[in-house]
Regions:
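Short beta-strand "wing" residues that participate in macromolecule-binding interfaces
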Residues: 56
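Basic, amphipathic "hinge/linker" alpha-helix immediately C-terminal to the N-terminal HTH DNA-binding motif
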Residues: 61-84
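A cross-family signal for key residues in well-ordered alpha-helices
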Residues: 10, 24, 46, 81, ...
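Glycine-centered, phosphate/nucleic-acid-interacting loop/turn motifs that mediate DNA/RNA or nucleotide
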Residues: 52
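Basic amphipathic alpha-helical segments that dock to polyanions
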Residues: 41-48
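N-terminal helix-turn-helix DNA-binding core of bacterial DNA-binding proteins
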Residues: 1-40
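Amphipathic alpha-helical dimerization/coiled-coil segments
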Residues: 78-111
């Protein structure tokens, strides 16, 4: 799963959101490393909707602007949970490899 897809699913885990809210949440979730462009966001949302992982969750007009809301489906929640488990497993293995490398370095030297 690509990072923009993961960030959109993670942002929707907190409840339904509109496009601007998803962009802001993705930026916050990534510690401001990722700013989703509008085109990227809606391409991700369209793909996730086709896969049954997100669904439209209503529309409204706020300050004269049309907002469409999205929410996770049960399948989307399952996919997000599975990706979190994969990322945690990968991170744990990377930490273990790093710890092994650090423990085999000669004192004062670079291995």
């Amino acid at each position: 799963m690509r990072e923009p897809t993961f960030l959109v699913l993670a942002a929707l885990a907190g409840g339904r959101k509109h496009g601007y809210g998803l962009i802001a949440d993705a930026k916050q979730l990534s510690d401001e490393r990722v700013t989703l462009g509008v085109g990227t966001l809606y391409a991700v949302l369209d793909r996730l909707a086709e896969q049954g992982l997100v669904a439209e969750a209503g529309e409204e007009v706020v300050d004269g602007r049309h907002r469409r809301y999205y929410e996770l489906t049960d399948a989307g929640l399952t996919a997000l949970e599975a990706q979190i488990e994969r990322l945690e497993s990968t991170a744990a293995k990377a930490r273990k490899s790093l710890a092994a490398r650090v423990s085999t370095r000669p004192a004062g030297g670079i291995a």
